[in-house]
Amino acid sequence: MPTINQLVRKGREKVKKKSKAPALEGNPQKRGVCVRVYTTTPKKPNSALRKVARVRLSNGYEVTCYIPGIGHNLQEHSIVLVRGGRVKDLPGVRYKIIRGALDAAGVKDRKQSRSKYGTKRPKEK
């Protein structure tokens, strides 16, 4: 417990909040180029082939990004928009690719939660 005099001299040190998406450097999104598109397996209780991409961002960082939704058109050299947001069962994946922006097409035949997957409103008949 510091004395009042010690607090006057030094003061309290503010606890610095660590960024959960440091590669974005405080920006909401960053543009990048796919270096490698591949699948990986999730952590223990789950089983699947999760679609991920290694992306070189415009600021020089290289990060692993999750590709959400069913099916995608991404390949090497695709230009993508990356946002923060981790995937709980994929260690080291702290970013997601935004569907429907730049080279990443929206999810086909998506009826619900369309805005999250970059899908246009279906035609009414």
Curated annotation (Swiss-Prot):
One Pfam short name: Ribosom_S12_S23
GO cellular component: small ribosomal subunit
Organism of this sequence: Persephonella marina (strain DSM 14350 / EX-H1)
GO biological process, one term: translation
Subunit structure and binding partners: Part of the 30S ribosomal subunit. Contacts proteins S8 and S17. May interact with IF1 in the 30S initiation complex.
Family under the similarity heading: Belongs to the universal ribosomal protein uS12 family.
HAMAP family: Ribosomal_uS12_B
PROSITE patterns cross-referenced by the UniProt entry: RIBOSOMAL_S12
Modification 3-methylthioaspartic acid, positions: D89
UniProt keywords, alphabetically: Methylation, Ribonucleoprotein, Ribosomal protein, RNA-binding, rRNA-binding, tRNA-binding
Region (Disordered), start-end ranges: 1-28, 104-125
Composition-biased stretches (Basic residues): 9-20, 113-125
Gene Ontology molecular function terms on file: rRNA binding; structural constituent of ribosome; tRNA binding
Matches recorded under InterPro entries: NA-bd_OB-fold, Ribosomal_uS12, Ribosomal_uS12_bac
Protein name: Small ribosomal subunit protein uS12
Function (record text): With S4 and S5 plays an important role in translational accuracy.
Keyword RNA-binding: yes
